[in-house]
């Protein structure tokens, strides 16, 4: 009775050792190059710098900063519109503004309101079971 159970357990343990092939993801060298160029160009900008870049940018998209990846390389379901640098600048500007707003909100809310938060501290003070 013990041998069939051991045999089944051994087969279950050996079964995953068969021919299993996983697909690993390798980043594209073009994508890595694009991210490096992007970070080199926009890494040290402040919100004021971004506003100046957006206001001084011409209407036609600049061809100086291209990723080197052609749209035809993407699958058909990936609908990638052609975007200029102004879209990236607006995105970065919005991100910086949101970070500033989050810091101001955090200081205004005052996260440090006792041991367990405002509601539980109020309940604890009414019942006499505070921390």
From Swiss-Prot:
A Pfam family per the record: ANP
Signal sequence extent: 1-22
Cross-referenced InterPro entries: C_natriurtcpep, Natr_peptide, Natr_peptide_CS
Record key words, sorted: Cleavage on pair of basic residues, Disulfide bond, Hormone, Secreted, Signal, Vasoactive
GO biological process assignments: cGMP biosynthetic process; receptor guanylyl cyclase signaling pathway; vasodilation
Tissue expression pattern: Expressed in brain and to a low extent in atrium.
GO cellular component, one term: extracellular region
Domain of life: Eukaryota
MF terms (GO), sorted A to Z: hormone activity
Localization terms from the record: Secreted
Propeptide cleavage-removed residue intervals: 23-109
Disulphide bonds in the chain: 115-131
Family: Belongs to the natriuretic peptide family.
Function: Exhibits natriuretic and vasodepressant activity. Has a cGMP-stimulating activity.
Protein's UniProt name: C-type natriuretic peptide 1
Organism (species): Oncorhynchus mykiss (Rainbow trout)
Upper classification of the organism: Eukaryota, Metazoa, Chordata, Craniata, Vertebrata
Gene field: cnp-1
């Amino acid at each position: 009775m013990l041998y069939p159970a051991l045999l089944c357990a051994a087969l279950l343990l050996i079964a995953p050792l068969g021919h299993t092939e996983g697909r690993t993801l390798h980043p594209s060298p073009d994508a890595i190059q694009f991210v490096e160029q992007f970070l080199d160009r926009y890494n040290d900008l402040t919100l004021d710098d971004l506003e100046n870049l957006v206001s001084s940018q011409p209407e036609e998209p600049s061809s100086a900063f291209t990723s080197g990846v052609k749209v035809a390389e993407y699958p058909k379901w990936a609908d990638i519109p052609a975007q200029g640098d102004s879209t990236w600048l607006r995105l970065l500007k919005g991100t910086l503004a949101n970070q500033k707003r989050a810091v101001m909100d955090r200081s205004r809310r005052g996260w440090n309101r006792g041991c367990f938060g405002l509601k539980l501290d109020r309940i604890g003070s009414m019942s006499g079971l505070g921390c």
